[in-house]
Amino acid sequence: MQHLLSAGDLTRDEALLILDTARELSQVSERSVKKLPTLRGRTVVNLFYEDSTRTRISFEAAAKRMSADVINFSARGSSVSKGESLKDTALTLQAMGADGVVIRHSAPGAARRLADWVDGVVINAGDGTHEHPTQALLDAYTMRERLGRVEGLRVAIVGDIRHSRVARSNVLLLTTLGAEVTLVAPPTLLPVSVDTWPCAVSYDLDEVLPKSDVVMMLRVQAERMHSSFFPSAREYSRRYGLDADRLARMADHAIVMHPGPMVRGMEISAEVADSARSTVTEQVTNGVSVRMAVLYLLLGGAIHRPGNQGEPR
């Protein structure tokens, strides 16, 4: 595995290796000194063309805990705002000797194009409405930590599937790991190609809820919409929002997930978001461990050299 561009590029064994490595590395976050020397001397560039809070900070924390040098690049205030192309930015990073580039971009496929232009490792942190593979990995990790497994789980992904890179990556990864995925959304918020996805589709949240082990809520991405996809926010929430009444109909062991950012009162109520069934804050915590594992494996960590001092313990 040279890059991480798509959840669909991962084999089952590769995905499990990342999850297992993340579990070992999670112990670092519990130490008083949260550092490993594994990536000392390596340079990781966070190349973010879209706004981000959780993902950018998570990757920065992950790289720094592995002792890498981190450069944060924002399109605002850079040559990009003056019209510089992605390719020219890539060539600049190449000339500076970046070992790894974490990219978020509004254009689907941007990460794959970048990988053609640089020698270093490229990690896709979200490319438009296409994919977000590390989010899917941290979601799978969270499921495994809470429920003990991923294989055989019934996972409902609810909301704006059409504009969600998280949904696409989760469908690809979770089915690779043996989960059964059902997408729940109004027809207008499903992608045209959804019939080619390896999952089921439902328009009825109340029918799917009692059968699900995991319910993953997605926000409506109004910033990507140029027309109306549903009658009103109130009507959407009535049919597809997760509130306390719907939570009570879920199986006792079932968990509620959300990749963030949440719109409380629309796709999820504050009561549900703050409940013991919610894994929202755990997902953020787990994201650092998973991204540490991805950086560790892709940038030549000691996992290939047993006995090295950088090996997770």
UniProtKB/Swiss-Prot annotation:
One of its GO terms (biological process) is 'de novo' pyrimidine nucleobase biosynthetic process. One of its GO terms (cellular component) is cytosol. SUPFAM superfamilies: Aspartate/ornithine carbamoyltransferase. One of its GO terms (molecular function) is aspartate carbamoyltransferase activity. Pathway: Pyrimidine metabolism; UMP biosynthesis via de novo pathway; (S)-dihydroorotate from bicarbonate: step 2/3. L-aspartate binds at residues 82, 165, 219. Its EC number is 2.1.3.2. Keywords: Pyrimidine biosynthesis, Transferase. Carbamoyl phosphate binds at residues 54-55, 104, 132, 135, 260-261. Catalyzes the condensation of carbamoyl phosphate and aspartate to form carbamoyl aspartate and inorganic phosphate, the committed step in the de novo pyrimidine nucleotide biosynthesis pathway. This is Aspartate carbamoyltransferase catalytic subunit. It comes from Thermobifida fusca (strain YX).
